[in-house]
UniProtKB/Swiss-Prot annotation:
This is Queuine tRNA-ribosyltransferase. Belongs to the queuine tRNA-ribosyltransferase family. Homodimer. Within each dimer, one monomer is responsible for RNA recognition and catalysis, while the other monomer binds to the replacement base PreQ1. Pfam families: TGT (PF01702). Keywords: Glycosyltransferase, Metal-binding, Queuosine biosynthesis, Transferase, tRNA processing, Zinc. The gene is tgt. Gene3D superfamilies: Queuine tRNA-ribosyltransferase-like (3.20.20.105). Zn(2+) binds at residues 302, 304, 307, 333.
Length: 374
């Protein structure tokens, strides 16, 4: 993987990731394909939204169908028929999400499978082995996602464990002679001093890119923006910066303003299935009865398949009847909206007009623009 920084506007960065499987223009949003599919979408439909890279979930694919089945097809790209690059998370966040079903030890994590209740063990080495078999273009280190809230002592202990696991992930990755990219994950909760220690430790080990983890886990939005403003500028300029699990459209905008290059989140797909649709003028709740006879499209500025062919009344009707097509059309639109937003941000950075773009974005959705402390 090669990262090229093309130009900047304030802290925002316009760049390009180049892989053997193709290039990714940044800032980029990665749709989430947890089980080897972006829910309800064919790979061709995902591609048509403008997505250039997907996220796959190591934890879930390991438990079902298992790496052996996927490897028999070649790798995850072959299994799901996606031609572009794939980033896989390491499984750390999913283990964190299990709560009391898991025990964290120095060697790794013991937990009960959410599928059949059997005891399972996951370690940095096992995570690297799984991701190697998946053929991930970007491999994520295995880490512990520090919960929120956490005391200073708890955050320190968790962050130090993640650093030791980062070294073990790097060692196994190098043993494999894996030709793909390996990203480190900065932890440290909402404490600046621990974010510094984490980043210093990771840069000493050396990675192809750096993710910011442990945000969007329940902390106030102000804390997320504060940590981003603090740590993002300290990440090596020649490496991509990835904000994990974020987020709403305004979170993407604020992340870009603070120098983030990559994002992923289930929000556009999950919200689509629940009838929450993102548009240039804010969120439309398609289940609201006011849309029952509305013959307009979702978004007059959107050229996605859904907006070119269907009305709000039809989408309301499909949702009311529980038709699968409704969820699919909603998903096509939301993913297209996210990609259109990212394209707009990229073009604004290129033109040196990011803040003008951001002003218009907030005016249209009817929200106040957050202050940026630069």
């Amino acid at each position: 993987m090669e990262y090229k920084l093309i130009n900047t506007d304030g802290r925002a960065r316009r760049g390009r990731l180049t892989f053997d499987r193709g290039s990714v223009e940044t800032p980029a949003f990665m749709p989430v394909g947890t089980y080897g599919t972006v829910k309800g979408m064919t790979p061709e439909e995902v591609d048509a939204t403008g997505a250039e890279i997907l996220l796959g979930n190591t934890f879930h694919l390991w438990l079902r169908p298992g790496q052996k089945v996927i490897k028999a097809h070649g790798d995850l790209h072959d299994f799901m028929n996606w031609k572009g690059p794939i980033l896989t998370d390491s499984g750390g966040f999913q283990v964190f999400s299990l709560g009391k079903m898991r025990k964290i030890k120095e060697e790794g994590v013991y937990f009960r499978s959410p599928i059949n209740g059997s005891e399972v063990f996951l370690s940095p080495e096992i995570s690297m082995d799984i991701q190697y078999d998946l053929g991930s273009d970007i491999v994520m280190i295995f880490d512990e996602c520090t919960p929120y809230p956490a005391t200073e002592e708890e955050t320190d202990v968790s962050m130090q464990l993640s650093l030791r696991w980062a070294q073990r992930s790097r060692d196994r990755f190098d043993e494999q002679q894996n030709p793909n990219a390996l990203f480190g994950i900065i932890q440290g909760g909402c404490f600046e001093q621990f974010r510094d220690i984490s980043l210093d430790g990771l840069t000493n080990i050396g990675f192809d890119g750096y993710a910011i983890g442990g945000l969007a886990v329940g902390e106030p939005k102000e804390d997320m923006y504060r940590i981003l403003e603090y740590i993002a500028p300290k990440i090596p300029e020649d490496k991509p910066r990835y904000l994990m699990g974020v987020g709403k459209p305004e979170d993407l905008v604020e992340g870009v303003r603070r120098g983030i290059d990559m994002f992923d989140c289930v929000m556009p797909t999950r919200n689509a299935r629940n009838g929450h649709l993102f548009t240039t003028d804010g969120v439309i709740k398609i289940r609201n009865a006011k849309h029952r006879e509305d013959a307009t499209t979702l978004d007059s500025e959107c050229d996605c398949y859904t907006c070119k062919n269907y009305t709000r009344a039809y989408l309301y009707h499909l949702d009311k009847c529980g038709e699968i097509l409704g969820a699919r059309l909603n998903t096509i639109h939301n993913l297209s909206y996210y990609q259109r937003l990212m394209k707009g941000l990229r073009e604004a950075i290129e033109q040196g007009k990011l803040e003008d773009f951001v002003d218009t974005f907030y005016q249209r959705i009817g929200k106040e623009k957050p202050m940026l402390d630069v």
